[in-house]
From Swiss-Prot:
Family from the record: Belongs to the CSN1 family.
UniProt organism field: Brassica oleracea
Role, per record: Component of the COP9 signalosome complex (CSN), a complex involved in various cellular and developmental processes such as photomorphogenesis and auxin and jasmonate responses. The CSN complex is an essential regulator of the ubiquitin (Ubl) conjugation pathway by mediating the deneddylation of the cullin subunits of SCF-type E3 ligase complexes, leading to decrease the Ubl ligase activity of SCF. It is involved in repression of photomorphogenesis in darkness by regulating the activity of COP1-containing Ubl ligase complexes.
One CC-aspect GO term: COP9 signalosome
GO biological process: red, far-red light phototransduction
Known partners and oligomeric status: Component of the CSN complex, probably composed of CSN1, CSN2, CSN3, CSN4, CSN5 (CSN5A or CSN5B), CSN6 (CSN6A or CSN6B), CSN7 and CSN8.
Localization in the cell: Cytoplasm; Nucleus
Protein name: COP9 signalosome complex subunit 1
Keywords linked to the UniProt accession: Cytoplasm, Developmental protein, Nucleus, Phytochrome signaling pathway, Signalosome
Chief subcellular location: cytoplasm
Record keyword Cytoplasm present: yes
Encoding gene per record: CSN1
Domain of life: Eukaryota
Amino acid sequence: ELEALLITDNQIQARIDSHNKILYARHADQRNATFQK
């Protein structure tokens, strides 16, 4: 699915709870994430 593709491609910071069908967004440090790209 699109969400899984975006997560594995590091486009969004999140994890998927496949049992409960919930997408948990990680609130990453935006400044740190910017410098890592």
